A protein has these predicted regions:
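Conserved short histidine dyad/triad with adjacent acidic residue
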Residues: 24, 40-54
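Short, conserved beta-strand element in jelly-roll/cupin
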Residues: 43-45, 55-70
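A cytosolic small-molecule/anion-sensing beta-strand core signal
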Residues: 64-65, 80-81, 99
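Short acidic-glycine-tyrosine-enriched beta hairpin
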Residues: 74-89
Length: 117
């Protein structure tokens, strides 16, 4: 076990994760985080549009249920339940939900703005 682990939180209760509306129809909860990564859950209503944006964090996601059109750079794909994706840091990306979706994302390093809410 790493010595710095003593100062890091290692367990997170799901019912303690605060839900934040990012844009209409897009709700986020930060489920857990450590020194080098952050885990987030997104509940996306059909028609929700997360506009094109970028951030310096690498992002890996998994579609638990539903579907969405995901644009990463110049490539657009339909992602359905069971699909996953990788978005390199600083690459513009956008998501438009086709049907209600539950998506899990990991960010590295952790997004500071997601630690606040």
């Amino acid at each position: 076990m790493r010595s710095e682990m003593a100062s890091e939180r290692v367990f997170f209760k799901g019912d303690e994760a605060k839900q934040v509306e990012m844009v209409p129809g897009a709700l986020r909860r930060t489920l857990g985080h450590g020194g080098r990564m952050l885990l987030a859950e997104f509940n996306l209503a059909a028609g929700a549009d997360v506009p094109s944006h970028s951030h310096p964090h690498d992002q890996v996601g998994y579609v638990v249920s539903g579907s969405m059109r995901l644009t990463v750079g110049d490539e657009t794909r339909t992602c359905e339940a069971g699909d996953s994706y990788y978005i390199p840091g600083d690459v513009p990306h956008r998501a438009v939900t086709i049907e209600d979706a539950l998506v899990i994302d990991v960010f590295s390093p952790p997004r500071e703005d997601y630690l606040e809410g």
